[in-house]
Amino acid sequence: MLVFRQLFDPTSSTYTYLLGDGERGEAVLIDPVFEHARRDSALLRELDLELLFTLETHVHADHVTAAWLLKQRTGSRIALAAASGAQGADRYLEPGEAVSFGRRRLQVRATPGHTSGCLTYVLDDESMAFTGDALLIRGCGRTDFQQGSAERLYRSVHEQILSLPAHCLLYPGHD
């Protein structure tokens, strides 16, 4: 059984997503926010889930990630795009790879444009995709900093996100 929670940080208008395999007790957190590490840790305990990975959709300019703090608290691993150029991750992700938790997997798709290291994570049955700042509600992420490119973002959104099946629900990084 898939466990899913959408969590929100009102200060940065940022979404964090928890996905877990309820039968195996393993989970991932996508884009955790530093100020909510305690909330996220408590939720994992409440749901009896072991956090395997914190997954970053990109290197964030608008909030501090909770990945390091959650790693210290839970022993989880940090994963982000190899193309991000960031240091200190336990796993650097390439397009086409998958991140497993229990019997479930998230496929890694490169969606550069907002930054050069943006990723979208697609659930194995293509029912859900986590787009970070590549595709937002009524818009997309800025392209005027962090090696952004409007042309690359347009191609990424059309080729990697809008090409998903019609039943796929899209979950953005911001409100």
Placement of each model-derived feature along the sequence:
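Hydrophobic residues in well-ordered beta-strands that form the structural core
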Residues: 30, 78-80, 130-131, 172
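Divalent metal-coordination and catalytic microenvironments
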Residues: 19, 31, 58, 70, ...
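Small/polar loops that bind or transfer phosphate-bearing groups
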Residues: 7, 28-32, 56, 103, ...
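Active-site HxH/HxHxD metal-binding segment of metal-dependent hydrolases
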Residues: 13, 24, 34-110, 127
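Conserved beta-strand hairpin/beta-sheet module of binuclear metal-dependent hydrolase folds
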Residues: 1-49, 121-132, 138
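Core dinuclear metal-dependent hydrolase active-site scaffold
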Residues: 6-7, 18, 98-124, 128, ...
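Metallo-beta-lactamase
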Residues: 25, 115-175
